Regions:
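Non-catalytic, structured segments within soluble enzyme domains
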Residues: 119-240
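Flexible, acidic/glycine-enriched loop-and-adjacent beta/alpha segments
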Residues: 75-127, 181-186
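Residue-level signature of transmembrane alpha-helical entry/exit and packing/kink sites
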Residues: 7-11, 15, 81-82, 146-150
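Short, glycine-/polar-rich solvent-exposed loops and beta-turns at beta-strand/coil boundaries
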Residues: 47, 66-67, 99-105, 124, ...
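Terminal hydrophobic membrane-targeting helix
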Residues: 34-86
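Short small-residue beta-strand/loop micro-motif enriched in glycine and branched aliphatics
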Residues: 63-65, 96, 214-217
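N-terminal type II signal-anchor transmembrane helix
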Residues: 1-56, 94, 114, 239
Length: 240
C-alpha cells in the first residue's frame, strides 16, 4: 500500500469514526430530551380500558349502549390460539423474539420512506410500539418525535412487562373500526358473537382489519377486507 492510499484509508476511517460519534451523541441527546416525557411502563400494567354504559333487560338482553368506544375486555387465555397466530403472522411475526423494536423491519420502513419521497408505505411499528398509540399515550402529530417516544417506551415496557401482558393489552385496545376497540368488541360488532365462536375465516378477517380499521373493515370496505383476509390466511400458511 502506497503512502497516498494509506492516507486516504486513514481519512476515510477518521470520517467514519467521526460520523459514528456524532450519531451516538445525537441519539444520546434525543434520549435525554425525550425520556422525561415517557410514562413509566408500570402504568400499563394497571391500565383501565374505557367501556361504554350498557343497559340490559331483566333477562340480561342488551337493549342500549352509550359511549364513543365499544370495548369488551378479554383475557389472553380466552383468546383463540388461531386468532393470536393470525394477528402475529400479520402484524408482528417476531413479537416473541425482539425486545420491543424490530430493527430489521424498522430499517426497511426507513428505506421505503426515503425511496417514496416521504410517503409511508410500510409500517415499522411492533405490537409493543403500537400499544401506547392505541391507548392515546402520545399525540398523533410530529411523526418522527412520536416514533422515537414509541421506541423508548417499547424498550421500557419489554423490560418491565411480560410478552403476554403486552399482547393482551394490544388485543384489547387496537381499533377495528365502527367504534370497536379490541378483538372481542370487533367480534360482536361484525359477527354478533364472541371471539371464541368465530371460524378461521372470520378470525383472519378480524386480524386483517387493524392495518386500516376505517377503510378496511367488512362494512366500509368489504372488498378490501376480503383481500386482506386472504393475505392473512396466506401468511398463516407460509408460517406453518
Amino acid at each position: 500500500m502506497t503512502l497516498k492510499s494509506r492516507r486516504v484509508t486513514a481519512t476515510i476511517m477518521c470520517l467514519a469514526l467521526a460520523g459514528l460519534c456524532a450519531a451516538v451523541l445525537s441519539l444520546a441527546g434525543i434520549y435525554l430530551y425525550l425520556d422525561p416525557q415517557i410514562p413509566k411502563a408500570e402504568t400499563y400494567r394497571h391500565v383501565r380500558l374505557e367501556t361504554p354504559l350498557r343497559v340490559y333487560t331483566a333477562d340480561e338482553q342488551l337493549i342500549a349502549e352509550f359511549g364513543e368506544r365499544r370495548v369488551i375486555p378479554i383475557a389472553l387465555a380466552d383468546v383463540p390460539d388461531l386468532f393470536v397466530r393470525a394477528l402475529l403472522d400479520t402484524e408482528d411475526k417476531r413479537f416473541y423474539e425482539h425486545s420491543g423494536v424490530d430493527v430489521l423491519t424498522l430499517a426497511k420502513s426507513a428505506v421505503d420512506l426515503v425511496l417514496n419521497m416521504g410517503e409511508i408505505t410500510r409500517g415499522g411499528s411492533t405490537i409493543t410500539m403500537q400499544v401506547p398509540r392505541n391507548l392515546g399515550t402520545f399525540s398523533l402529530d410530529q411523526l418522527f418525535i412520536r416514533k422515537f417516544k414509541e421506541i423508548l417506551l417499547a424498550l421500557k415496557m419489554e423490560r418491565e412487562l411480560s410478552k403476554d401482558e403486552i399482547l393482551e393489552l394490544y388485543i384489547n385496545a387496537v381499533p377495528f373500526g365502527k367504534r370497536a376497540y379490541g378483538a372481542q368488541a370487533a367480534a360482536y360488532t361484525y359477527y354478533g358473537k364472541p371471539l371464541s365462536d368465530l371460524s378461521l375465516a372470520q378470525l383472519a378477517m378480524l386480524a386483517g382489519i387493524p392495518q386500516a380499521p376505517t377503510a378496511g373493515n367488512p362494512i366500509n370496505g368489504p372488498e378490501r377486507a376480503v383481500n386482506r383476509r386472504n393475505l392473512v390466511l396466506r401468511r398463516m400458511l407460509e408460517q406453518g
